[in-house]
UniProtKB/Swiss-Prot annotation:
Keywords: Periplasm, Signal. It is found in: Periplasm. It holds the Pfam family YtfJ_HI0045. It comes from Escherichia coli (strain K12). Residues 1-20 form the signal peptide. The keyword Signal applies. One of its GO terms (cellular component) is periplasmic space. The keyword Transmembrane helix does not apply. This is Uncharacterized protein YtfJ. To H.influenzae HI_0045.
Length: 184
């Protein structure tokens, strides 16, 4: 194989390897624990944080969303979040878990990101918000920086579908259909 062919092949395969996440269908997400900040808790109008780990992703069907702490990342899969809100999924059997990587935020914006999460927690108290100040999930799951990943988990916490990056309208529909199937 000539050097030119090897170089061309490398250029073609490199983007696929760079965006390869660590989620395997039928398996649990690779284990992580977030001790700096962690899960945002709302109790009697008071916010606090508690340690969170991925072993807690059992018991409900869920969409696990990992997003960089920047508006551009949040917007990548806003269509899916709107579809989930519109579907009015049963809170006793479904939960959205959002992990926000504030380590991947525009410098100085972390306070604003946390304020936005607090507002969302008040609006959607049944949803779970995790603040990852050190980028633990990003590294362990090999996700793209400045992006948004979506993982659908069954009630046993096993991956049913995953993508790192913006979802197409067809993929949003595929996720919604899968959620309805898993909730039956």
């Amino acid at each position: 194989m000539t050097l030119r062919k090897i170089l061309a092949l490398t250029c073609l395969l490199l983007p696929m390897m760079a965006s390869a996440h660590q989620f395997e269908t039928g398996q649990r997400v690779p284990p992580i624990g977030i001790t700096d900040r962690g899960e945002l808790v709302l109790d009697k109008d008071q916010f606090s944080y508690k340690t969170w780990n991925s072993a807690q992703l059992v018991g409900k069907v869920r969409v696990l969303q990992h997003i960089a702490g920047r508006t551009s990342a949040k917007e990548k899969n806003a269509t899916l979040i709107e579809a989930i809100k519109s579907a009015k999924l049963p809170h006793d059997r479904y939960q959205t878990t959002t992990i926000v990587n504030t380590d991947d935020a525009i410098p100085g914006s972390g306070m604003f990101v946390r304020s936005s999460l607090e507002s969302n927690k008040k609006l959607y108290p049944w949803s779970q918000f995790i603040v990852d100040s050190n980028g633990v999930a990003l590294g362990a799951w090999q996700l793209d920086e400045e992006s948004s990943a979506v993982v659908v988990l069954d009630k046993d916490g096993r991956v049913q579908w995953a993508k790192d990056g913006a979802l197409t309208p067809e993929e949003v529909q595929q996720v919604m259909d899968l959620l309805q199937k898993l909730l039956k």
